[in-house]
Amino acid sequence: LHMIHLHWYQYPPMNPMMYPLLLIFMLFTGILCLAGNFVTIWVFMNTKSLRTPANLLVVNLAMSDFLMMFTMFPPMMVTCYYHTWTLGPTFCQVYGFLGNLCGCASIWTMVFITFDRYNVIVKGVAGEPLSTKKASLWILIVWVLSLAWCMAPFFGWNRYVPEGNLTGCGTDYLSEDILSRSYLYIYSTWVYFLPLTITIYCYVFIIKAVAAHEKGMRDQAKKMGIKSLRNEEAQKTSAECRLAKIAMTTVALWFIAWTPYLLINWVGMFARSYLSPVYTIWGYVFAKANAVYNPIVYAIS
């Protein structure tokens, strides 16, 4: 009880019908996510042609998403069944930590996937090819930095607390002290605004490079009086462009999923009167459901 902010006590209990809806939604997304990401990992690890340095990043993304749902899904089912957090204060902190950790690892893995596409498509032969050693180093950097940021609340820089209808736990965005808020300012920059800026920058140049390449191909085909100039090299470039589109889709879905939860954090800091348990819990659940999208995107592609 000492971890629950007084803001949540002013609201009446949530409509009992909401809990079965949350339970069904989490059951559906949990099974879909665990199965989809497991299949993604299995296929990429057991298909020789897919065991490339770039796909190590894809496997890391699937592992991060799998871990998120594996740790979020069962506790959420329990708390929705009992209509409140029943797993104790320690597990609340662990739960909040793991959710933040996996979300942070996912977006920075996507940033490195985007950067690899930028290197291949924009820089071309001038770019340094991604090696297994370099991809492994990137993955190590992702997890070390994510761990460092997400462990900070355990040492007094912000904290993990129950939120919304008290069936989930996350960072404390209702405390007004400057120390707690400073963490959210910096963390928002680190896991949202900076990745978004890098991604937009890379894809602006990727789109320009692809458009220039396609125009060059069409012009050359016209000069030669043929319909298409799709030789082996062109087919390879086309495949790289498809991979860039897949990466862009996964990144876009991540930002669509996590933007409502970011807004909840900032509304909690500056306009908490607009923050209700219903909006908060659905924003929270929608963000976690992002772990479902990636295997679907890769399967369709």
Curated annotation (Swiss-Prot):
Contains one covalently linked retinal chromophore. One of its GO terms (biological process) is visual perception. InterPro entries: GPCR_opsins, GPCR_Rhodpsn, GPCR_Rhodpsn_7TM, Opsin, Opsin_lateye, Retinal_BS. Residues 44-55, 116-134, 205-245 are cytoplasmic. Belongs to the G-protein coupled receptor 1 family. Opsin subfamily. This is Rhodopsin. Disulfide bonds join C92-C169. It comes from the Eukaryota. Residues 1-18, 79-92, 156-182, 268-278 are extracellular. Keywords: Cell membrane, Cell projection, Chromophore, Disulfide bond, G-protein coupled receptor, Glycoprotein, Membrane, Phosphoprotein, Photoreceptor protein, Receptor, Retinal protein, Sensory transduction, Transducer, Transmembrane, Transmembrane helix, Vision. It is a multi-pass membrane protein. Homodimer. Interacts with GNAQ.
